[in-house]
């Protein structure tokens, strides 16, 4: 099953492994993933939204981390595009989040970096992919914002802007951010 690689024996691994598998199943047979069987839906990107664990001794902001992976499948996606597109997607989304959060909420919001790491969710999808670790759910300084609905809206809008910029760059199109 695309939802349970372990056939129900390990809910933890099924949770994170199913995401890349079902992205490939949805996109299989389409122009973005022509060699795999699937539903022939041209999925342009995959995105995993997480918070992560971690605390600081002085309760400072932990901030936002972006994760992608390039060193799989000969550094190419199924359609032949460079896996470095995941870096570009990650950079656009993370840059929009950090800029908007610093502007509207917290000038000291931390941009933790972009990790090119072999996380299953970043490695397996055959389309550009980003894992976002928005903030630390164990850290009070982060969660002061993480519990604020206005912050949720700002972050969601920043993600939308980054995805819009990424997609328009892929299709060589101008973009207009939907006004509020």
Question: Which residue ranges define each predicted feature?
Answer:
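Acidic, glycine-rich loop-and-strand cores that form catalytic or ligand-binding grooves
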Residues: 78-107
């Amino acid at each position: 099953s695309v939802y349970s690689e372990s056939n129900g024996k390990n809910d933890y691994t099924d949770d994170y492994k199913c995401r890349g598998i079902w992205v490939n199943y949805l996109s299989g047979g389409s122009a973005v993933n022509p060699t795999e069987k699937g539903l022939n839906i041209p999925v342009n990107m995959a995105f995993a939204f997480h918070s992560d664990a971690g605390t600081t001794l002085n309760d400072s902001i932990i901030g936002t981390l972006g994760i992608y992976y390039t060193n799989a499948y000969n550094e190419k996606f199924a359609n032949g595009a460079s896996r470095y597109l995941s870096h570009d997607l990650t950079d656009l989304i993370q840059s929009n989040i950090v800029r908007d959060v610093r502007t509207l909420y917290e000038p000291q919001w931390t941009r933790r970096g972009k990790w090119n790491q072999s996380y299953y969710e970043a490695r397996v999808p055959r389309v550009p992919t980003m894992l976002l670790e928005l903030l630390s759910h164990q850290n009070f300084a982060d969660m002061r914002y993480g519990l604020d609905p206005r912050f949720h809206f700002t972050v969601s809008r920043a993600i939308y802007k980054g995805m819009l910029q990424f997609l328009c760059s892929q299709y060589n199109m101008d973009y207009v951010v939907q006004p509020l």
